[in-house]
């Protein structure tokens, strides 16, 4: 039988709920006390939350706007190839590179001599006071080959040095400094071609200039490196210093006391002393910049001398630093372990000299070096020197380890006299791609007129030591050549300047650019040794995949 309480609960189900509600009401004050004890979110906390979400929304909105609404700035689209022609002109063995129009693509500067002013120039030879023909300088866009600026600069040019480095805080523009054959000495703005300064030469018209113009640290405190010009008259070599920003002579001319007859080099010893090095027949002569500066200004507050070098020079009657086994032909500074070393090429041998004590590190004997060596990387981050040994059909390309002189690679590659120099470009694997010029058909070269012989451009990479890639064939007379990284890590190309072989016979002058990667698919694969299992197309694909990087 059902209990009375259960029966009542079944008949009046809400009655118990009312009792529970009353019990809960009785406990309400305690609950409210507990709620009052709980922390209530402050206004500052709410403001922080609102600020956070507002900032997040703004950031997302900005990202959206930058990504989808505002277009990216137009990047100049570099053409794979272009060509610029000048009729009835002659040109010079000179190419300079730099970003003239500041579009992050390298541009090309060159010289040509023309009777008529170009359509790209607003000034003629007569406007600048020259008779026709006169020498023009032109800056050409590396992007598409358009002329950025062009103007007549001299009656004829003997020497030119472009893009003189300036300090960051200097107000002096980078410049091209030109020395004319008939007495002019001037500098023009690298970016606009406008004249920065112009003066007559300070030495006799019978004197010949010893190239190149040497650059010395700032003497007159104007923030620009200054210039040292050496000239030879008779048996005497003299030098003069000029301000890099104004062109005015600093002091007077002074004799070096040597009978040098070749290209001068400025060398820095381990102590930081600067010396002018000159080939003197079968010897190497040296003069301290400090000593020359003291002679021409009467002051000795700039530069320093190296005691050990002064001892070597004082022991010689004619300021000879060392004697060579043959006539000194080329001299160049190369990176050493603790500073600059010297690579000396004579008519008998090639040797690397320690940059401080001039002791040979290695010697390559019985050489007949065709032209000034170049540097590259055969192994990753390890410098190699490229030597073109022999002449004409007997020429060999030698790659030597710069630090030890050991042979890394060699290959016969016949050429004709006057062929363009070799060059190299660093690749992404920290090696170098090397570019050599040679004869397309050495067998028939002896039977052909040199003017009808084709020069071939060959490409070599150390990862494929048994392969040469023939990229192009050129029958025109090549005046200047260089391989250039026009955009960092984007594309490499070669620049070719062709023109008449004689400056007395005007003709067609052409400046051309060709992208290396676009030449690879149509190239000819030359196997130097047996055993390569890759097909020619696979080899071309490997060359096409090469990526290039800047040296610095």
From Swiss-Prot:
Keyword annotations of the record: Glycoprotein, Membrane, Phosphoprotein, Signal-anchor, Transmembrane, Transmembrane helix
Modified residues (Phosphoserine): 21
Coiled-coil parts of chain: none
Superkingdom classification of source: Eukaryota
Residue stretches of biased makeup (Basic and acidic residues): 8-22
Membrane topology: Single-pass type II membrane protein
Membrane topology (Cytoplasmic): 1-49
Disulphide bridges: none
Residue numbers spanned by region Disordered: 1-40
UniProt keyword annotation of Membrane present: yes
GO cellular component, one term: membrane
Location relative to the cell: Membrane
Pfam families recorded: Beta-prop_FAM234A_B
Signal peptide: none
UniProt-annotated glycosylation sites, renumbered to this chain: 116, 119, 314, 473
All ranges on the Extracellular side of the membrane: 71-552
Transmembrane residue ranges: 50-70
Annotated family: Belongs to the FAM234 family.
Name recorded for this polypeptide: Protein FAM234A
Underlying gene: Fam234a
């Amino acid at each position: 039988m059902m209990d009375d309480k259960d029966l009542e609960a079944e008949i009046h189900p809400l009655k118990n709920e009312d009792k529970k509600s009353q019990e809960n009401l009785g406990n309400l004050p305690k609950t409210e006390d507990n709620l009052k004890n709980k922390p209530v979110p402050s206004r500052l906390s709410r403001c922080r939350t609102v600020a956070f979400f507002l900032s997040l929304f703004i950031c997302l909105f900005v990202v959206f706007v930058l990504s989808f609404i505002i277009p990216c700035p137009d990047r100049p689209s570099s053409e794979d190839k272009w060509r610029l022609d000048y009729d009835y002109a002659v040109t010079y063995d000179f190419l300079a590179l730099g970003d003239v129009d500041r579009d992050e693509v390298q541009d090309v500067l060159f010289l040509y001599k023309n009777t008529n002013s170009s359509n790209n120039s607003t000034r003629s030879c007569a406007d600048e006071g020259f008779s026709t023909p006169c020498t023009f300088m032109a800056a050409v866009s590396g992007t598409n080959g358009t002329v950025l600026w062009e103007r007549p600069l001299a009656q004829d040019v003997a020497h030119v040095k472009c893009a003189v480095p300036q300090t960051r805080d200097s107000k002096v523009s980078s410049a091209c400094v030109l020395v004319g054959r008939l007495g002019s000495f001037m500098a023009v703005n690298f970016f606009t071609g406008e004249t920065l300064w112009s003066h007559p030469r300070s030495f006799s018209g019978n004197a010949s200039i010893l190239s190149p113009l040497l650059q010395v640290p700032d003497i007159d405190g104007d923030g620009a490196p200054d210039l040292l010009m050496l000239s030879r008259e008779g048996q005497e070599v003299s030098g003069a210093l000029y301000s890099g920003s104004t062109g005015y002579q600093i002091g007077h001319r002074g004799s070096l006391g040597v009978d040098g007859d070749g290209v001068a080099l400025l060398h820095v010893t381990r102590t930081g002393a600067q010396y002018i090095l000159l080939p003197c027949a079968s010897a190497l002569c040296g003069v301290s910049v400090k000593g020359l500066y003291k002679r021409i200004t009467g002051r000795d507050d700039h530069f320093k001398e190296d005691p050990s070098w002064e001892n070597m020079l004082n022991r010689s009657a004619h300021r000879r630093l060392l004697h060579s086994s043959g006539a000194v032909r080329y001299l160049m500074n190369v990176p050493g372990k603790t500073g600059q070393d010297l690579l000396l090429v004579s008519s008998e041998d090639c040797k690397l000299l320690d940059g401080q004590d001039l002791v040979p590190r290695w010697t390559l004997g019985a050489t007949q070096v065709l032209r000034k060596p170049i540097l590259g990387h055969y192994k990753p981050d390890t410098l190699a020197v490229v030597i073109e040994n022999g002449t004409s059909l007997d020429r060999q390309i030698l790659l030597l380890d710069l630090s030890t002189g050991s042979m890394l690679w060699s290959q016969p590659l016949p050429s004709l006299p006057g062929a363009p120099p070799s060059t190299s470009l660093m690749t992404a694997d920290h090696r170098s791609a090397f570019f050599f010029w040679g004869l397309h058909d050495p067998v028939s070269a002896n039977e052909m007129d040199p003017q009808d012989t084709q020069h071939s451009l060959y490409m070599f990479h150390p990862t494929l030591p048994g392969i040469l890639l023939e990229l192009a064939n050129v029958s025109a007379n090549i005046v200047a050549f260089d391989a250039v990284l026009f955009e960092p890590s984007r594309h490499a190309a070669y620049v070719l300047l062709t023109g008449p072989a004689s400056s007395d016979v005007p003709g067609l002058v052409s400046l051309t650019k060709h992208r290396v990667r676009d030449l690879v698919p149509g190239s000819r694969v030359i196997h130097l040794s047996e055993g390569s299992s890759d097909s020619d197309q696979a080899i071309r694909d490997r060359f096409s995949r090469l990526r290039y990087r800047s040296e610095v």
